[in-house]
């Protein structure tokens, strides 16, 4: 059994609570900006309470080395981090965020706003830490993922150009989402939702959460927040 790791915070810091995350994210959904080009997507602001963002950034996970290889996240499956069962036990912020996105109050709002069907799916939250040399080839997420939320977290001003790259159906680069702390890019995967990350300099660590709901066909159950509990 792993020992729980204490994370230090400044005086006056409010510990992350699921209810606060739910309220904050519902507000961000209600004020989301929708775009139809090149596919339906949404831009969200102020997704989480500020203290929750700080709690996530304080997680004691080192950014893994790329060892000269990039292009697909699955190339580094052995070093990826998730808000999984173990990390939910060890870190209150992982538990708070996972409980929020498992909660009917939030899932029903996601269904209503984004038009996806979450019934019978499972929550998967990846804590992504990208370093210089990272890139991702264009891909759609179509298949076992029925919802994708890319939540940007790192606060380095130089990261403002490190948003998600967006492509058309022929994988031609069109534009890039804005990268700002606590902002997000959302889409419902389909056969044309091409996105990726063009290789460019990354100063420090580009930190984000990748939040998906996946179908029961998802094989890597250890990555799931609640592997035995589907969304109802």
Located regions from the model:
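Short N-terminal signal/transit or membrane-insertion segments
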Residues: 1-22, 79-91, 139-142, 146-147
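Fe(II)/2-oxoglutarate
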Residues: 1-37, 174, 223-232
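Intrinsically disordered, low-complexity segments enriched in small/polar residues
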Residues: 10, 66-69, 161, 194
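Membrane-targeting and insertion segments and their boundary/processing signals
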Residues: 13, 18, 22, 26-30, ...
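Intrinsically disordered, low-complexity regions
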Residues: 13, 69-72, 170, 205
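Non-heme Fe(II)/2-oxoglutarate
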Residues: 21-24, 29-113
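Catalytic core of non-heme Fe(II) oxygenases with the double-stranded beta-helix
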Residues: 89-102, 106-228
